Amino acid sequence: LWHNFWLDRDNVSLQTVQNPRYVFEEFAARPRPAAAPAAPADELPPFDAFDLDPAVLAAQSNEILTAVIQGARKEETSPEVQLAALRALLNSLEFVRLNFEREGERNFIMQVVCEATQSPHVAVKVAAFENLVRIMQLYYDKMRFYMEQALFGLTVLGMRDPEPHVALQAVEFWSTVCDEEIELSLEAAEALEFNEEPTHVSYHFAQIALPEIAPVLMELLTVQDEDSDEDEWDTSKAAGTCLGLLAQVVGDHIVALAVPFIEGNVKSPDWRRRDAALMCFGSIMDGPESKLLTTLVTQALPTVLETLHDPSPAVKDTTAWTLGRM
């Protein structure tokens, strides 16, 4: 267990925090079974075997965070060490709430993670975006400054990344934003019902970013593999889910962006684009007000019914799903 590595096993104590690189070099250099030889950083699996023990984190969060952040910095020359540090950070985020309350420490953590999203090593980039997803989930109320300064741009770039694992995590970031803002909206409605002030405030990140992120999500719907497993989670499925959550947050505002995409692709010669158009239409059903939605469905129904006879099995499946949502 990782906590045994941190605490005195093999004569390693918490004084090792003074030399954090040593710890992560040890992780990166640990022998692997013959069936699993050492892999390049871009192919390294998650460091599940090194999950941090919650009890250790609660007691030693400052010292461990210092070591982790030092190893995760862009100045680190070993991608394996940086990846191990980012994995450790991901596991420790829940336990460093006091550090996130302090602006200087929070700024440094966010700087290190944001810089890691620009790493030339895919596994490091993926781990950095995984951290951003978790940070948004845990510390939404602290993210306004960072969204304005960096996260809007970084995550849009991430969604456009040609490496699907990077794009997937960038999409998950916005799904998390939407999840948080849906919860905040429900909380605000409940507070209003009792004539109270809500405990937390929404910064409406999704609404602000809508013109930038919605078109990217719609294009990601076209990135399907005809032979992919139906149950396999991929960028296209993640984009559809995110688009649905986005529609719930922004309501009618999604329509002006979705309709041109749907109309421009539903009769495309490329089955992927036809499928994406139908997926887009089905995904936004929970967003607009019922009156506007009724108008949309009435106008679109004849075209959607035509696609039940599409030569592509994938398109026919998506048509059936969309009709079930209408």
Go through each PLM region and give its residues.
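Alpha-helical scaffold domains
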Residues: 11, 80, 91, 134, ...
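Hydrophobic residues within the alpha-helices of tandem HEAT/HEAT-like
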Residues: 1-6, 16-28, 43-49, 85-96, ...
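Short inter-helical turns and helix N-cap capping residues of alpha-solenoid HEAT/ARM repeat scaffolds
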Residues: 8-9, 13, 76-78, 120-121, ...
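Acidic, Ser/Thr- and Gly/Pro-rich intrinsically disordered linkers and low-complexity segments
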Residues: 76-80, 194-197, 218-236
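Long, polar/charge-rich, low-hydrophobicity segments
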Residues: 124-126, 153-154, 159-160, 172, ...
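HEAT/HEAT-like alpha-solenoid repeats
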Residues: 1-5, 31-73, 100-117, 144-158, ...
